């Protein structure tokens, strides 16, 4: 549930916040967050229990689509298969080309910092998405505070095989400044680490979840645009239904079709991104 609350209510929850520029607040007391590493590890472990096989450090280097089946080429050998699913994240465009489809995907390098509060370790008691400063802030169990910046902002194109995995100094300085402005007691807090990862973005900032328009037994789950982790359980369920039954049963995913960018029927709503 989302509640619309006043600025005075916000001060009850976050007494250390500077309310300059804030006119209204959306409050979600039952919301939470997930540890991405632990979640992916749990999914992999359950997949192994159910008979799945996973390989690491064995990248796809090509796909032969000329026959009745596809041959996925890897350094460890070829894999012949009737069904190919492209869920390759920032490598999805290259994989798509091997699947004979040019996907409208852009890669952007996204950055975060982690700070150690100088003195007030209890100032952040909620996850904060600050639309005024375009920042997001979250306390970690070890007392550190995660800080990043939201959209709209300039995308930073990157090569998924070769990109800087730490935040830029300019980003660190500006994000630290924004944190100190919104939570004055955190001004000057030590930045203990930073990192950068990649978003794979579609033109409407919603993913493509569809059967390939080129090959019948090829499927696409690409372009999560920064929010695929939180919808991944439903995404996997719908994709499995599409493969087994010919269409998704749990929810209508037709708006996420691969052709929408050619027809102009893009998805109007979005979780975020550089859209008005």
Regions found by a protein language model. Give the residues of each.
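A short alpha-helix-loop-beta-strand transition element characteristic
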Residues: 1-8, 102-105, 188, 246-253
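A short, glycine/Asx- and small/polar-enriched loop/turn
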Residues: 14-22, 64-71, 201-205, 214-215
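General small-molecule cofactor/ligand-binding pocket signal
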Residues: 3-5, 53-55, 192
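Helical element adjacent to the flavin cofactor pocket in flavoenzyme catalytic cores
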Residues: 26-83
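Active-site lid/adjacent beta-loop-alpha segment flanking the redox-cofactor pocket in flavoenzymes
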Residues: 102-104, 117-218
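Helix-loop-beta segment of a Rossmann-like dinucleotide-binding subdomain
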Residues: 2-50, 158-162, 216, 222-224
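C-terminal catalytic lobe of FAD-dependent flavoproteins
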Residues: 36, 177-276
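Central helical "cap/lid" subdomain
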Residues: 78-126, 250
């Amino acid at each position: 549930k989302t509640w619309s609350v006043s600025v005075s209510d916000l001060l009850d929850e976050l007494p250390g916040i500077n309310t300059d520029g804030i006119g209204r607040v959306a409050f979600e007391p039952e919301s939470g967050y997930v540890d991405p590493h632990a979640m992916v590890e749990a999914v992999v472990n359950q997949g192994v229990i159910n008979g799945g096989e996973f390989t690491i450090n064995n990248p796809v280097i090509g796909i032969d689509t000329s026959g009745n089946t596809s041959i996925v080429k890897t350094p460890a050998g070829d894999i012949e298969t009737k069904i190919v699913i492209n869920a390759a994240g920032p490598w999805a465009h290259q994989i798509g080309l091997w699947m004979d489809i040019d996907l409208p995907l852009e890669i952007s390098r996204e950055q975060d910092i982690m700070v150690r509060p100088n003195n007030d370790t209890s100032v952040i008691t909620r996850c904060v998405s600050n639309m005024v400063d375009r920042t997001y802030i979250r306390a970690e169990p070890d007392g550190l505070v995660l800080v990043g910046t939201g959209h709209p902002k300039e995308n930073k194109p990157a090569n998924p095989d070769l990109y800087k995995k730490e935040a830029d100094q300019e980003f660190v300085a500006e994000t630290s400044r924004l944190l100190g402005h919104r939570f004055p007691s955190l001004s000057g807090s030590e930045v203990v680490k930073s990192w950068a990862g990649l978003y794979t973005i579609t033109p409407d900032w919603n993913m493509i979840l569809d059967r390939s328009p080129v090959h019948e037994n090829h499927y696409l789950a690409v372009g999560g645009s920064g929010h695929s982790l939180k919808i991944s359980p439903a995404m996997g369920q719908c994709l499995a239904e599409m493969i087994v039954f010919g269409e998704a049963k749990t929810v209508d995913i037709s708006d996420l079709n691969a052709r929408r960018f050619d027809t102009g029927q893009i998805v109007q709503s979005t979780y975020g991104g550089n859209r008005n």
